[in-house]
Design a protein with these regions (language model features):
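Catalytic histidine neighborhood in serine/cysteine hydrolases
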Residues: 176-191
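Catalytic active-site module of serine/aspartate enzymes centered on a nucleophile-bearing elbow/loop
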Residues: 188-191, 196-234
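Alpha/beta-hydrolase fold nucleophile elbow
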Residues: 101-113
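Short beta-strand/loop motif that positions the catalytic acidic residue
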Residues: 150, 156-158
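Serine-hydrolase catalytic machinery in alpha/beta-hydrolase-like enzymes
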Residues: 5-102, 191-196, 200
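Active-site loop->helix "elbow" adjoining a glycine-rich segment at hydrolase catalytic centers
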Residues: 113-116, 138
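A conserved short beta-strand
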Residues: 128-140
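Conserved alpha/beta-hydrolase "acid-adjacent" motif
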Residues: 163-169
Length: 234
């Protein structure tokens, strides 16, 4: 297993991250934290640990630089700038494709709260690199017009007792034209603090990623065999 503290370059700042890549990883999960959080989010770290046991690499990174963090703590001007956060994720997706341990691996964007909107925006920009988007208690509505342009599969995970966010996710699901699923975690509130709630999230997300990896493999197999079938039929 490779475990490193990394620095991810973007157009205007460098961002700190923690990259862990188990041996024979099948994909890498890039976490996008919510407003007021960071790469140290205990909930994201718990989910990341579970996903690594399923053979997925993880990158937890800050979406704001240190100076931006300090300013945002006073003004909250960056935390809802979904365009900015989306560009940061795009830069991270591109960076992962330059690293020897993650080059060529499919990328799963896992967003929480406002990070989910940023993940959807990034998925529109990198559909060939992003395998799927997973949203945990997310605000997909904040993705704006990008929501209708997402083409990769999307999983929306929402707590059953998080009524306002559940309603927003139900509306977002109606706007998605890509393959998608809305999964309600029974009795969970917005932060999934209830016993077993985050484990439920990690297990459901892991199964979803397994299925999407299988779909991608099937698609590649079909693409390789389709010309041969066409020649036989003619």
């Amino acid at each position: 297993m490779i475990s490193d503290m990394v620095v991810v370059p973007t157009a205007d700042v460098t961002l700190a991250g923690d990259l862990v890549v188990p041996a024979r990883s099948r994909a890498v999960v890039l976490f996008a934290h919510g407003s007021g959080s960071s790469r140290h989010s205990p909930r994201n770290r718990m989910v990341a640990a579970e996903l690594r046991t399923a053979g997925l690499g993880t990158l937890l990174m800050d979406l704001l630089g240190e100076r931006e963090e300090r300013r945002d703590a006073l003004t909250a001007e960056h935390r809802f700038d979904i365009g900015l956060l989306g560009r940061r994720l795009v830069a991270a997706v591109d960076w992962l494709d330059t690293q020897p341990d993650t080059r060529g691996l499919p990328v799963v964007l896992f967003g929480a709260s406002t990070g989910a909107a940023a993940a959807l925006v990034a998925a529109v920009e990198r559909p060939d690199r992003v395998l799927t988007v997973v949203s945990r208690g997310g605000r997909p509505d904040l993705a704006g017009d990008a929501l209708e342009r997402v083409t990769v599969p999307v999983l929306l995970l929402v707590g059953g007792r998080d009524q306002d966010v559940l309603a927003l996710n139900q509306e977002a699901a109606r706007r998605l034209s890509c393959p998608h699923a809305l999964h309600v975690v029974p009795q969970a509130t917005h932060l999934f603090e209830e016993p077993g709630a985050l484990e439920h999230v990690a297990e459901t997300a892991g199964r979803w990623c397994d299925d999407r990896l299988w779909d991608a493999q099937e698609s590649r197999t079909s693409a390789r065999t389709a010309p041969a079938r066409s020649r036989e039929e003619t």
